Amino acid sequence: MTGPVNLTAYFSNAWIAVAPAAFSYGPAILQVFPDAGSQAGGDTLYLFGFGFGTSPGSLTLTIGGAAATVQKVESLPSFASALSLDATYPFSLERITVTTPPGSPGKADISITASSGHATAPKYFQYLNASATFPRSGLYKFLLNDPLRQQVYLSATDHVDVFDRTAQAFRSPIEPPPNGPPPDAGLRGLALTPDGSQLIVADFGAQSVYLISPDGGANNGAQVPVGGVPGYANSGPARVAATSAATVFVGLSGEGGSTGGCNSCLGQMDLTASPPTLEPAPQPEVTSLTGAPLLQADSAGDTVYLAFGTAPGGPVAQWTAAAPNAFTVSSANDSSSDLSTSADGTLFAMRSMNATEIRGPDLSLFSTPVSAELEAIPGRVSVPGVALHPSGALLYDPFLDGPPPSAPPAQGIRGGIDIRDAHSGRLRLRSYLPEPFAMLSADVDGLHGNFLTTDENGEYLFALTTSGLTVIQLASMPLGIGSLSPASGAAAGGASITIRGSGFQSSTKATLGGKSANVTFKDANTLLMTTPVLSAGPQQLILSNPDGESVSLDAAFVAQ
């Protein structure tokens, strides 16, 4: 027997007392935070578990076979406040603080040898492929990945900086057309048309939207004045979403008091008109909705999800290219503060009162990820920029471990990213950034900033941090399930199913309804599966990789 066991005391009066996990046969590692770090080493990790002993000198700990430096060993009372645990917490938990050694990119085992024995936590830590900050002076608030050109756009106050992903260097910035930045410029949200030919930029300060060719050249763009919102001291466009119907939805925001609710904060721009002009969105389902909308389109521009956090009932909405003259609206009763859409358009994430919700294409809520006790970070602040893996399998949740400053520089705080399973909410990976996010205390929601995005495969993470752009490249993507298409079929089997997700390998295996299913690898985010003979009803899908990693999704497929 190894690991923690309960202690039970039996009394002559028939009473018993139980101390859960009060004794451990040798060391046992429960969790490690963070569980991703630089291949150069030097990161501080916290290992939680049992049977570690009391002296750092009596422990030997290795990560990927290389010796780590043990800083200290603590029993629960000394670190309870760091996890917001009180005296009612029943387990005799222990914590080791270590400094990571250098390592090779990929998953690594953590092994510990104590006077009481030895234990190994297989694949518990990931050395990142890359983690670097590229300095650039600017008050950045929003960023956008361009998969066609392999570029990242960063909106500064009066221009858009361009980061070349291949060269890992900044290129010449893009200035607002036609004659450079106006004196009152205040750039915010960014979007690309589905074909990538135009970069759409919202200028809150100048109350304009810019249509720009990212390739540059003469006459490479146009300015479309959109005006502000009556009754507000400051107002203008904050978010934009381009569609496959050659339209752009514009979310306007008002700040500094109002004489009434905003009844025209969702606008629609026709890109085929010359010149393009903005009008209030004409669809009857949204004409009566008030408040500044958060909005984002999928990569094809076929679906746009919206959230009206200040409107009565806190509604969410969906627009589709299949029915461009109508919206689907549902009352969510949420005070939404951030929103992100998966590139596939199969689901969207939104923040409400510091909780993150995952909703499906029918706008229904199916997941609200929460932190387990040991995952909690006291003083955690959500950073605008919640993101989804392109398939919808994973949620990228940016945070600070303390309040952001009112003005630069940020001191005494760290920035990090939690990667969670979008369906179950389970924490799959936590990584800290080399420096904090560039969030300021005024950046209260997704109308004021979007500090995190991913590449087209969810492998590269791009973060706006205090001195520029931080780029993280994961060495191993967490295995995840995003969606199945179609999600139902004949119980007789033989149906061809496309599985979208993350972390797929050529040797990934699948079981559906407890039966092995034939799988063909297409790419790291796509599998083709042939269904086996099944019983009628909903079926659980389980995917597994050769290193033992597995993930499941209940009712993933309905056999009919």
Indicate residue ranges for each PLM-predicted region.
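Beta-strand/beta-sandwich contexts
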Residues: 14-59, 68-71, 75-82, 117-140, ...
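Blade-level signature of beta-propeller repeat domains, shared across WD40, Kelch, NHL, RCC1
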Residues: 442-478
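Repeated scaffold domains used in trafficking and secretory/extracellular systems
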Residues: 138-144, 185-192, 230-242, 285-299, ...
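Short loop/turn segments that connect beta-strands within beta-propeller blades
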Residues: 164-168, 213-217, 270-274, 319-324, ...
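A short beta-strand motif characteristic of beta-propeller blades
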Residues: 129-136, 169-181, 218-230, 275-287, ...
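Short glycine/acidic-enriched loop and turn motifs that connect beta-strands
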Residues: 159-160, 205-208, 254-261, 310-313, ...
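Short coil/turn segments that connect the beta-strands within blades of beta-propeller domains
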Residues: 148-150, 195-197, 245-247, 301-302, ...
